[in-house]
Amino acid sequence: MWDMRAVAPQRPAAGHPRAGWPRKLKTAATRFWATCPSSSTVCFLFVIFAVSTVFHCHRRLALVPAPWAYAGHVVLFPRHLPRGGVFTINAKGRLGNQMGEYATLYALAKMNGRAAFIPPQMHSTLAPIFRITLPVLHDATARSVPWQNYHLNDWMEEQYRHIPGEYVRLTGYPCSWTFYHHLRAEILQEFTLHAHVREEAQNFLRGLRVNGSRPSTYVGVHVRRGDYVRVMPTMWKGVLADRGYLQQALDWFRARHHSPLFVITSDDMAWCRRNINSSHRDVVFAGSGQQGSPARDFALLTQCNHTVITVGTFGIWAAYLAGGSTVYLANFTLPGSRFRMIFKPQAAFLPEWVGIAANLGQARESHP
């Protein structure tokens, strides 16, 4: 009889590992730890993953900000677009231009019975400052819509009351009260400052004094220079506000208000300090001087009682929101300027605003 123990290994008893198992386990564990990353490496990779995830989520959310920024929704797919037609508009220029584009879209869409949607770029510019309500049209949706471009002049025309087409993208640089002034209350509501933006501006103004006393009248002054220093004399045959204009504008308010305080904002504060007479001790150079961060300067201007502006849509919008009296630079281009073909002063400045003519002597010398 064969002794089976001599030809085959004996099976282990139930519930016990095979013979030699501890040695195999030790060998496997050794190989695992030899190839497995260290704990510090694992932690480092986890941090990289987390940071990358947050970064990309932030970029994604930048186009779809938190609900407080607007009351509408983000349209992701064409089937979500409302029936009856849609208006949108290009997002060109900086803050003042895009405010004009937004207000024009708001008014013309309502006038034509269309739904209005803004591009993400416009939302990114306006929503951090204002409590705008128009919904955002996602880029992926916009690319799949058969848009019909419709160019607008800078002022309202009768034909804009009946704009043809189902999906219309308005183009141009519209910024005129003639588009939207009949909806002034609604436009002011759209451009209501967020509470924290308004409170920061008001806290700054409350801390200002004229000869030791808190002023009863604040006059915001916006001096636009920047690229206009080059563009205005060469391209448009015009001039910017000079020392004489600013002196006349400030004196206009001094003659009508007791101890007003002038709050100066500008993209060239050094020029303002050299050219604005502050000997009356009623001038505060308050602006940041930074074009890239306009919210603070804009908020300061809108919280003042009255406004002095020079050129540009930034100042025009600040004056429109502030209310009160506004003094503006008038007749700042020569009669033959191409600027007069695309800009109508009577459509840019409200009728009750006060114009002070620019000194065109330098422009005439440059363009005889």
Curated annotation (Swiss-Prot):
Its main location: Golgi. It is found in: Golgi apparatus, Golgi stack membrane. Keywords: Glycosyltransferase, Golgi apparatus, Membrane, Signal-anchor, Transferase, Transmembrane, Transmembrane helix. It is a single-pass type II membrane protein. CDD domains: Fut1_Fut2_like (cd11301). Kidney. GO terms for cellular component: Golgi cisterna membrane. Residues 53-368 are lumenal. It catalyses: a ganglioside GM1 + GDP-beta-L-fucose = a ganglioside Fuc-GM1 + GDP + H(+). Pfam families: Glyco_transf_11. Its EC number is 2.4.1.-. The chain crosses the membrane at residues 32-52. One of its GO terms (biological process) is carbohydrate metabolic process. Pathway: Protein modification; protein glycosylation. InterPro entries: Glyco_trans_11. Residues 1-20 are annotated as: Disordered. Belongs to the glycosyltransferase 11 family. This is Galactoside 2-alpha-L-fucosyltransferase SEC1. It comes from Bos taurus.
